[in-house]
């Protein structure tokens, strides 16, 4: 260190006290004589209070005469002699001004004169002057004493300044010795010195040679000169070589080699080191070369592998191109549909995945070529798949053509039957329907082909043109044109399908109510022939609509579609139905009452369910005749005999063969289109019949007559294994409700939502027949048309259906108005995997439960998953008998509409349906859950008729369950939606196609984790929250770092749930040049209640560092938490924090929060906490400002034994050094809190303070607090202000005193302090030694004794007492003094 720094620090340390004393003495004399009198009263207690005199003028205030402390700049500029001269001159000026102000002190020179004047006045005034004179005399004596005291003080200060000058000289000498350590040599200097040494050596050699050269021989001289010239060349070459070596090492070696080459001289040893370094460099380069060679070999192998792969791909490409060419030739003549595009899209995805995998392996040079090849391969694969799809479509087209033939034959037979009945009106209507059907069939079939061709022509394979062609308008009897709305193009139909399906889940409650809306609005009915014609138009067009996955044209009002794959979609107008529910209910009740009177119990054709798939024309005619006749038992008997006809059996065999062929072609994805092969032959993903859409839109026109066409709920059905049965049923039901008179008792489309996933939908002709079943005047002419269409009962006993129908018609109470129209029992759809008995039961139950009111059958949403139909029958029969038998217009309308056999047994769902119908009171608008588990019902509850049916249906259910389980396994494997597959009914293997169509393979449910980071202009907020629920460890740690403009804020919050629960919080704020570090640690204990608190605050002027440490320990000695936050200013770096937590189980916690400022560094902090017996905590926080260094802080906590840990680390700044602070806390003994406030100015130094428990008074430990006079300098600051302090004893001794012993006793210190002995010599003999008191700031109320033992005392300055009762202490720590135990770094 420089001597100037130590001079400043020592002057700071010791000069403050005399400066303050002088200030107090000088300032109190003129301004407050009362205070002066009090100071004198301390020695002379009998003196009377002195007279008050006027204060000196403000312009001559004593502050003007304060001695300025020379700053560092002035000390650097002025020599010591000039500085001493200035101080002496200033002191003389102060003395002269004081004499002028208060008078001269020569033996009361002025005061007797003052007394004389007062005496003269006393003669005139009288006795009062006597007292005044006495006061004047006393004041004169006091003034003389004060002047003497001031003179002594000034003289002592003058001598002290002289001594201080000598002291500075000694310190400067000592510092020069201590600073003799050479600084780190500069490399350039060392190299220059070495070069100079070499040149000097060469010069000496040349000089010697010249001296030894012979003068006589010139030749010898010439030869020597030649040698001299050659040698420098050799030296130059060596130097050049050495320079090259150094350059090589600098370029390739590490710092170690650079240092060696730079610092060491060019000796043999250094050269060997350099060569070794070069060898290491070469070795490293050789290793790198070897690694590069190995990498090259690996890359070559990979390249060869990629070439092989490329060749294989090229060969495959050629093969695929050939196949592509073949497919292109075939593609021109074959139609296509949306399924081809979707299949192509899935292949494209697979090919893309393959291409990505292959591209990763390929080198970047060939990626472009490979991409092109892969695109071609993908095209080939697409075309190949399209070829297969087209082949399947050809087969489907043939089957559809065959269906069309059957339909034509059926309609012709139906027309003949109607004419034979003699009913001209119905005959005319049927004729119109036939013509319309034929015309539309002829129109729709070419349209279908055109759409397929147009879709095939779409080379991109993208489903961009998923639209349904607009179809010709159909004129209704009302005269309005019903336009078939063209569906919009959709880039991703899967998204729209999914969105509608999701909406359908929310609006499932509106399904049944929506059906009633159409019934309420049907004020006038349409003739059955009209509705029949409209429904017939849906036959041919439905195929095309089903092929296209158009989702946009959902049922417009009353239709709810349950997709077989997901959930029932939302009907667009279902909300409107809810508004008019109550009105509809009232209207339907009135209508049912009227209808009951006019309707007859036409138990119509129970045998229709026994009809075969290929709709025998004979059976159709019989059904029509039976429905057109009055309800008579003779017709029932005739119809009962119909299923036994040989023609029906032939048709059954034909249908079975057709279904087998269809299954083979569709990979079991198409479940035999046995149901209505003439109409429905629905594709796996056939969505809906276009004619159904037309029927719905026709129904929307509600002029006078809202003919309630149960508007094809399958309109939106993307039905893989489903056919349009429910659509026709819905239409029939709504048309039945429309009667001439208000007899609209519609069992309103209970099964509107029913989607027969694995069931062939009822024939659309059945829908038409049902629609035509509207009551005309006296009776309901229900054209049970084409019962055979629906009668494909693969796994059903047709006999059981008839029995169930007959039994339930008998069971139904035929009391008042109980006209149960067992209408179209034959219309029950052929449920491939469902018992037909359950269908009939569902129909009977639903129709019976509607008590005179249009009770919508709640089976709309019911989907029966592997449920026994027997239990359903039981529930149905029970609930049919139980409801009140009044005014029952229960029309068994389309009983099979309610059955959605998606591998479900209809038993439990019927039970649920019947229960909800009975409990719902009048409305019963309750939608059932999609999947209801089996509810086994014992045979005890079965009626005798049901037991018979049970025995018959057991075989069917067993077969059904076997197939269901096998297909269920396939479908589960095919399903790529793990989240929804569990809640959905099982599906056939064609589910993969559905997934491909909807792009559902892309749908993956992911967990979203939200992460937030806020980045301002220069602000970064990071929040970490860690929670550990283990027994001993911490629970929550939260870190929030905020970076301001030049500010770093750290906040740590840790919470522990272990036994020693701790809580710790820190908050710190940083300003322009200020560092506030607040550390608060709270340790909660269970055994020992008292706490230990240590509080430290450091305050600095311009560069202030504040440390706030609050440590509270409440447990047995186990501290579980440490919290630290350091705020760093402009140029400060915060170090890491290490915390080790040890509880019942050892847990180590290491946390590093490291921030970097401009170029300064902060030390790390380490805390070690141990469990029950001892707790060791070491805390070190170093903050470095511009010129300030704060030393480490060490805290050691010991529970049972008294130990002390001392940490001596000093950091040195420009002018200021703050020493370490060490505190020792004892657990079982009474602890004490000592707040230390350290004020650091521009030239102040804070030393090291050791504090212990107040219980130990016998030991004195006050290290580095030797406030010796030798280390004090600089009394005065620039502006001297009055301050208050207690002084015990001031001993002024001559400088000849060789040794001084300083002892500081305090109740806080328990260890003996090391006595500091030093001998000081002073030049002049008249100099005196003044010992000024230490100003230690401690809590008020604690006294401090300072004993300065001196051999001789010339005189004692009078002590000045403070006006404040309690003494206040101010600790001015000076740490940079040259103390013996202080090491220098």
From Swiss-Prot:
Residue stretches in coiled coil: 299-330, 374-411
Biased composition annotated in UniProt, kind: Basic and acidic residues: 353-364, 437-455, 481-490, 573-589, 665-676, 685-697, 712-726
Record keyword Zinc present: no
Superkingdom of the organism of origin: Eukaryota
Disulfide bond annotation, renumbered to this chain: none
Tissues expressing this chain: Expressed in epithelium of normal cervix and cervical cancer. Overexpressed in early and interim cervical cancer.
Membrane-spanning parts: none
Keywords per UniProt: Coiled coil
Region spans: Disordered: 329-364, 422-545, 572-752, 809-834
Amino acid composition bias (Basic residues), ranges on this chain: 339-352
Bias-annotated ranges (Polar residues): 425-436, 493-503, 511-528, 536-545, 654-664, 701-711
Function: May play a role in tumorigenesis.
Protein name: Coiled-coil domain-containing protein 7
Organism, scientific name: Homo sapiens (Human)
